[in-house]
Amino acid sequence: MVQKYIKIHSDDLVAVALCPLEKGTVCNVDGQEVTLIEDIAQGHKFALKDIKKDQPIIKYGYPIGIAKEDIQQGSWIHTHNMKTGLNDLLTYSYHRNVQELEPSEKRTFMGYRRKNGKVGVRNEIWIIPTVGCMNNVATSIERQAQKYVKGNVEAICTFTHPYGCSQMGDDQENTRQILADLIQHPNAGGVLVLGLGCENSNIDVLKNYLNDYDSDRVKFLVAQEHEDEIQDSLGIIADLADVVSQDKREEIDASELIIGMKCGGSDGLSGISANPAVGGFSDLLISKGGTTILTEVPEMFGAETILMDRCENEALFNETVDLINNFKEYFKSHNQTIYENPSPGNKKGGISTLEDKSLGCTQKSGKAPVVGVLQYGQCVKNKGLNLLSAPGNDLVAATALAASGAHIVLFTTGRGTPFASPVPTVKISSNSRLYSNKKNWIDFNCGGLVEGVSLDTLSNDLFEYVLSVASGKKVKSEEAGFHDMAIFKQGVTL
């Protein structure tokens, strides 16, 4: 039976339309009849009782904003009659609320074991320019090197970016660290680092950011030192292909998987279907000893105390407070309003305030304890749920997840996007209409919730799908040949 509306939490003052509802529709919610006094679009909210001006509006069991006026039962609730209730910097206190997950049966996937013990889910050759001046050269090399994509050489990809020179301070450090992280990513069976020669982030400097690397698989070329950098690079790619082609997939325990979690183009159903399904997936993977990473810090604002209270100890709580407040200070340093969110697309889909968006966004974290807090560019160390410092921008955040060690990124969306990151990026739709309309973008559909599919079923099905991707199944963006990256920029350009 098709479910037409949902009250998410017993304390909620609103319900969410799971399909378009017409004015005059009588909704029976917890034994109470609510007659809609206006049309309600899919993903949008309506009042379950009269709400007074300045009264908090409750959804997910938490306030998502404040009524700007008296709101009548059955009314549409959105930006016209509610506003954010959030302030700037806050003082937080630790109220430990940790739920340990019971271990579950082991599962395996077919991956690549690297010489340093790390695990990859792809066996690709990556071309990484140190500086934006080399982007076109790198792209030309990639295009001409496609003849080497065969057998166990799964792809040859270039990751271009506009940085590597004319940068100072944190920006320069961020660029170097992200490039170093990608150079050492286990999804790359081989890497050509392509430098110009005179840039700030030149190859000699970058080598200081690398750990012990396999010299048979990581090669360097400085273009200013070669008469024909393209032909010489193609020779290096040919040698790398000979090495990479010898790699074989083997059975690996799922406890070694690291999965990034991100949302973008969210709608009013994202926090009800897709994000909770990813949260269930995260708990399932962690119960098997695996690791997940949650980022997009600005979209934690308004829901941060939930994550803080799930920190395993007070030291992690303090790190999470710094994670949140440092990002708020970043906004303030640029004279930007901290809560200038959600986007026009979010609002069209039914998300009204940042609290509304954040409480839906953090559903991806499931119920597991927070075991680690990572700075931008820092690789994950602790198995379990980790928080990562990165902005909400889709490509910047997804690249940060990959740089921190994610083998795969799970990306939920209610509006849709074709983008790809350096690692397989699984697009998960919150509604079936998007899945039907954009099958060339979307890999997994959570819209079945409206048709009666349970969240547990969706999470279990998603887990099986992720194991298949980890074992080599290509996602839609890979089939289209899409790979991309972006680096977080904060400062001046010389």
Spell out what each predicted region is.
Residues 1-408, 415-418, 423-494:
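Metallocofactor- and cofactor-centric catalytic cores in central/energy metabolism, strongly enriched
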